[in-house]
Amino acid sequence: MIFKSFLLGNLGSLYIKIINSVVVVGLYYGFLTTFSIGPSYFFLLRARIMEEGTEREVSATTGFITGQLMMFISIYYAPLHLALGRPHTITVLVIPYLLFHFFSNNQKQFFDYGSTTRNSMRNLSIQCVFLTNLIFQLFNHLMLPSSTLARLVNIYMFRCNNKMLFVTSSFVGWLIGHILFMKWVGLVVSWIRQNHSIRSNVLIRSNKYLGLKLKSAIAQILSIIFFIACVNYLARLPDPSVTKKLNETSKTETEEEESKESQKSKESEEERDVEKETTSETKETKQEQEGSTEQDPSPYWEEKEDPDKIDETEEIRVNGKEKKKDETEEIRVNGKEKKKDEFRFHFKETDYKRSPGYENSYLDGYQDNWDLQSEEEEEEESTLGFEKPLVTCLFDYKRWNRPFRYIKNKTFENAIRDEMSQYFFYTCLNNGKKKISFTYPPSLATFSEIIERKMSLYTTKKLTDDDLYSHWVSNNEEKKNNLSNELINRIKVLDKGSLAPDVLEKRTRLCDDENEQECLPKKYDPLLNGSYRGRIKKLESESTRNDSIISAKGSLEKIWKNKIHSLITNDSREFEHQMDPFDGESLSAYMTHSLTSISKLSLELVSIFHFEDLALLTEQKRIDFENQTKRLKFLFDVITADANNQTIENKFIEIEKIDKKIPRWVYKLISEEDYLAQQEQQEEENEEEAPLDFGIRSRKGRRVVIYTDKNQNRDQDPNPNTDNTTTENDNSDTGEEIALIRYAQQSDFSRDLINGSIRAKRRKIVLWEMLQANAHSPLFLDQVAKMVSFDLFDDLRETMNLIFRNWITKEPELQILDSEEKEDREKLIKIREEDERIIISETWDNVMCAQAIRGCMLVTHSFIRKYIILPLLIIAKNIGRILLFQLSEWDEDFKDWNREMHVKCTYNGVQLSETEFPQNWLKDGIQIKILFPFSLKPWRESKATPSTGGLMKEKKRKNDDFCFLTVWGMEAELPFGPPRNRPSFFKPIFEELDTNIRKVENQSFVFKEKTKDFLKKKTGWVTKIVLLKNKIRNFFTKVNPNLLFGLKKVYEPSENQKDSIISNKITHESTVQIPSSNWTNYSPIEKKMKDLSDRTITTRSQIERITKDKQKGFLTSDINIRSNETSCNAKRTELQKDILRIAKKRSIRFIRKLHSFVKSFIERIYLDIFLCTINIPRINLQLFFESIKKILNKSISNDERNKEKIDETNQNTIHFISTIRNSFSNSNLNNKSKIYWDFSLLSQAYVLYKLSQTQVIKRYQLKSVLQYHRAYPFLKDRIKDLFGTPRIVHAKSRPKKLPISRINAWKNWLRGHYQYNLSQTRWSELVPKKWREKFNQRTIKNKYSRKLNSSEKEKNQQAHYAKEISYVVDSLSSQKGKLKKDYRYDLLSHKYINSNYEDREYSDISRLSLQINGDREIPYDYNRQESDYVLVGLPISDYLGEEYFIGVDKNSDRKYFDRRILRFDLRKDLNIKTQINRDTETNMNKNGTNNYPAIGKKNPFSLPIHQEINSSKKKKQKFFDWMGMREEILYRPISNLEPWFFPEFVLRYDAYKSKPRIISIKSLLLDSQKDERNEIISKTKNINKKNQKKDLSNQKKHLEVENQEKEDFRQVDLRPNPTNQRDPIVSDTRNQQKDIEEDSVGSGVKKRRKKKKFKSKKEAELDFFLKKYLLFQLRWDELLNKKMMTNIKVYCLLLRLKNLKEIAISSIERGEMCLDLMLMQKDLSLRELIKKGIFIIEPIRLSRKWDGKLIMYQTIGISLVAENKDPINIRCRKKGYADENSFNKSVRQQEKMLVDRDENDYDLLVPENILSPRRRRELRILICFNSGNESAVDGNSVFYNNKNVESCRQFLDEDKHLDTDAKKFMKLKFFLWPNYRLEDLACMNRYWFDTTNGSRFSMLRIHMYPRFLISWW
């Protein structure tokens, strides 16, 4: 049984233990390190391959294994690791040994001394082999696969507890792998040696010494490989002797800069965060040290980087006196003058570099600023005579060696050192045990080491790991017990009847004084967080920082209130001290210096105390002032005394932060641009000092001078070569130079790097091209190859199509090509050509002496072309014309030749002149541009009227007016572009000859055709003559009476013969082949040729047939004559044969023509039928609909109630769809319908009276109807029953069945209030038809649009487009009969449904699916009878504003977006009045008419239900309200953008971002009221003080008048309780009045400030724009940039010419010079600049500010379903009402309450809520994560028990409606919260580490709870 249990039960566990054991893991990782091949493998293999002997093999193997053993030992032994891991050590080992190695190879005889025996180990060469393998094993691993395998052992060391066993086992594993590898190598070598086929080579046999030569060659090859490997390794650090030295900033300069910065910081006011922890100074030190890991410190840290900065002219002495010096601040110490910096402490390398992780610490970064050394070190340096240590000179750690980029800060002069790694390994306590953390703050590690070193005097015994863990467990238990007892005590007090507020734990507050018990205000309390915290101004005045208090008692106790400071202050130094009488000024200066030095405690961490001193000082009663000055220089409270022994103590009012110094580089580097700027500035100021040399590599560029403005001798010096860096006293000779910088268009990977640093090693990036913009790894070459192969395939396909095009039988004439694909191909071709040009230019620029060669070739070709080739061609041409007896063209040709100009240009194409060469053109390059290039023509064209072809040629000629000369004398359109085809001289000659030949051919062809026609006519005449003869012959045969019977018999065949002849004639006309209807494959010329050939064939056949018939006719006539002699039977048989022959011939002809006849006949029938079907019904329908429409229009025009202005539609057009739609929609106006059912006749008072009398309708019946978000078919029946039963209409007049229009009334009403689809009556009355037509041109078809007839669309597309617009307009104006009454019934019915709000049972009927903005929330004011519900005509802008805000969830009811709502260009002078607005309602006076109050501002987005256009009144409008945005919108999910730049863009921008393809981006900026707004801006900028006061008074008077009018208006109100209702308009006017008063107050404040005065309107707008560019960015257009550069190039040429007319006109015609850019107006506004395309504004994508709780939930990983994150209105939240849509959405704590809650309800259902949140979290963590049980940390069974989840489900299944009971819901909430403590998990980091830094949050092993299994949560 035991054996079975061992086999079955424990076999798996035993296997797992063996696998996870340290020995097995070490063997595995050690074996893997074998595959990491290093440089030493070369020597190991060399000893075996070269057959150097057994001793060499043994020594090589021994050295190799010894070196590897040393590497493994260095992993465990830190000193050896530091010795072998430092680059200094490796460099010292490599450089001497390389020389020794090569010397030993060359001088082998020198090393072969001693015994001559081969087996002797005394041979020095064998020892060198051992040493070589030993040393090179210590180097980094070089070859396959990577050094990661060698570092696997180091990585696993952090996870292993038994490290020594792991190192030993890993070495054994490596040894096993090495033995196997060497065995394999030995087998391969022996196989090669034994294989005779390899060794027995003919060459080897013929040469005896070839083997020896081969061995020596292999040795040399291995030496070369070894040398390359070593050099590659040494490339890590550049040679210090070759490296360029950087400019080091002197100490005096840095002090001066620091003092200037300190003065600036004192003068400026800065904000600082007042959150400070008051627990301990150690805690603050840790936090500040942790904050040091940031790479880019904030400006706050930058300004406080050296708090002890004082004026440099100030001198402080310890005795209290103050003297002034000129340069530096000095302190007398032991009779020596030393600088202030020498009193700073400095870390010694020998003291604090013991830890393994020190090499990555921040101490290296601080050493550049810790400039002080000890006195002993300074003396040694002075004796040796070196300014710096030798190691520092050779290996300067302060300079840049790695390829870092210089990050310059505006505040700091020197760059900040941010090269330290983010990983720092150090031991820390975690759960009471020491563990290695790789993100430990290095500054905190340094601080702890200092504290431990100083505390070693106090503590003699260190705690073990077990003691630390037990101590941690006991502390946690004690904390848990204390918290539990406190909670129990509070519960007991609560049970006794105490009040809950007294029992609850209060929030900890910070008090000023213990006696008075007064706490700091919430704004300044550092213990508070959240909304109570604020930011205060920090004043640097001395009065607020310190306070002098004189006291003679209690000074000793107050000295030692900071004991940590006593451990980290400076070392004890001997000071000379002299007592002087008390001096207040010296004391204040001394205290200032001491106070400012306190903030450097984190850096100046050196103690001055010893344990014996502390024991003595505690026993002293009187302090000796001399000892105090020696030891208490930097105490927390600095104490001094006067002669009267009165102690003066400096007391802090607030706690000073412990700051640290930011590590900065000593070297002050400048870029090349800064260097040139400083150089020019010094030249202007005539300073002799040369600027510092630039140390930063800039982009490769060359300065090209394009123009030199000289006042004198300008024409005498055509080739100026002035130097920019020198200035002369004679200003007449030198002038201002205008230069451009030409950058190299190639890859510049060394840009912004520091001179002297090595280049970045890109092992995986290969550059194989001259110009490679996107350098990538060779791994992606396959993708590039695929792209190239695709391109090659496309080119091959095109060539194949060209070759085999003639082989294709049928090719369509029109080939449809994809335009987008064509454009893409053209773009690719342009890009390729551009890349080729750049490659060629950079090749010429990079090759040595290439520019000089190219320039000389260009100049030579230019001279040969201008003065040799072209004149010879002109002479040859004119001589040829004279020989051909034509007029010569000497004058014209030489005139064009003189017009050609060869302009010298710079390398990038900037034109200079014909005679002026650019500076340094042999070095920088040159281009030659040919203007008006001469082209030789055989003859001159006549100056006739230009045709279309002539215009094209003229345009092409203008484009060919310039070119660039290539190296080979060709012409190119662009520099380095492909040579273009020059116009051929002989091409027009050959074309002229070709045209003449074609003319001759055409004439001959015409002659042939005419001859054919003539012959055809002649043959026709011949046939007519033959027929006439036959007729005469037949006539004479009829006259003979004897032959009457025979003739009768013979007559029939003669008739048949005649018919045959006639049929032959008919055949002559019909034998012409009918051309095929498929003529698309033939061109017109081919058709003509084919017809002519057919005609010739037919004529020839007809002639042959006629000749045959002639012969046949004569033969038959003979037979007929001789037939008198024959019998009748013979005649009959002959006649039958003739009949059969004729019948056969006709049948053949009929069969042959039958197919074409049937086809043509059917086509003609189909065509006729189609035309009939189209025309006849169309005409009938047209007449029918026109008659119906006339009747309807007549009935509508008779209606007196329709007084609105509706444009008449065109009566002549055919309205198919609109007429049908109007007929159905206006069916209620039919004559058959009774007048009682026209609801427009019912008055509002009557309907109100009938509704008030009915008791049938109940609101709960409409609850389900209104809660539905979709229009189901059964809704209309429900609404019909509800509103049909109250008998609003008389029973007598009501029919049995309602008409269709009345049944659909409520459905149309619901649809009319849909967000984006207005009803037809609303749409018809908005704006006149002109605007509708203009607007609908940009609209899209929505889901209700209809399609027109396809035939109409094909006939005329423009007419169809105009008809479609009119149809949409007509469809919107269908419900004309209810134009005024429809809205009133909607309002009345909704009022009635929502009346009597006292009953709160059905108060959750809040709204329909229409979502509105925050300012439109339903107030739930039950005392108000008039409410602000959504069915009263809210503007569409509200819906647009909420729907298009970023982050707001879209409404589920919105299915389609109709762009007709967005009316962006409706900016005319219209004062739109709306009937119903936000807080106004319909008012009824005595006469029954309605008065509608007007809105105070225009709203173009507001498309309300009823609008009246009144153009008589014009109201001024503010600039910031030109979009008509609503200023009362309370909630915006994006951010409040109104104070930002251009708030009018916000609403449009949100709409555009949601639908960018529908809305044009131009609509964001277009506005027709430009001039008006510009005037308003200019007026507001220039208003003086008097006008402001007058305007304010006028505005107040105007508001008072409006308020009086509104009060009069309210008097006629018929509402029941008008006094209980607030008037929103009055409140709005009060708000306006308040704003005006605030503006007046603010204007008084602004008077005191110095305001910048702008000279022009443009400056004011641009200044405002640049200040508010946070939302929009400004950039130049790329096209505009090109235009500007081309203009500059033309200007450079024009400035050098005397006659500018011809060149200027030519450049304007070519488009090189843009006149719009030349005529830049000075007073252009920003809007005009945008319109002209000079500036382009692009919106920046707004970032959303996430909720902090939401980030916490996402970080932990449990995402809550949050469909809508909009908070409920505050006033609604208090009463507990919410939107009904929120029932299916997530609930966030303290944001939304689904139920009512009492203000006195303290949520005490959970007892732990008595404690504060911080103490509560602490208690939960201590209980859940039991510190005494380790298994509880790894997995808590309580939270992983499935039974708990089931119990949760059972609990929820008890009642599905938990929201109805507040207590049940609170129970549920607090039941779920302990199981899902998300906040507790997130706060664990803060609790355990006692810090707010969350950088190590991801390092915690958080065990997540299972997800809750209920779907609705």
Swiss-Prot record:
PANTHER family: PROTEIN TIC 214, PROTEIN TIC 214-RELATED
Protein name as annotated: Protein TIC 214
Domain of life assignment: Eukaryota
Subcellular location: Plastid, Chloroplast inner membrane
Presence of the UniProt keyword Transport in the record: yes
Function: Involved in protein precursor import into chloroplasts. May be part of an intermediate translocation complex acting as a protein-conducting channel at the inner envelope.
Oligomeric and partner information: Part of the Tic complex.
GO biological process: one example: protein transport
Acidic residues bias: start-end ranges: 303-314
Regions that span the bilayer: 18-38, 58-80, 84-103, 124-144, 172-192, 214-234
Provenance organism: Acorus calamus
Gene: TIC214
Biased segments, Low complexity type: 718-729
Region (Disordered): 245-330, 707-734, 1605-1652
Gene Ontology annotations for the cellular component aspect, listed alphabetically: chloroplast inner membrane
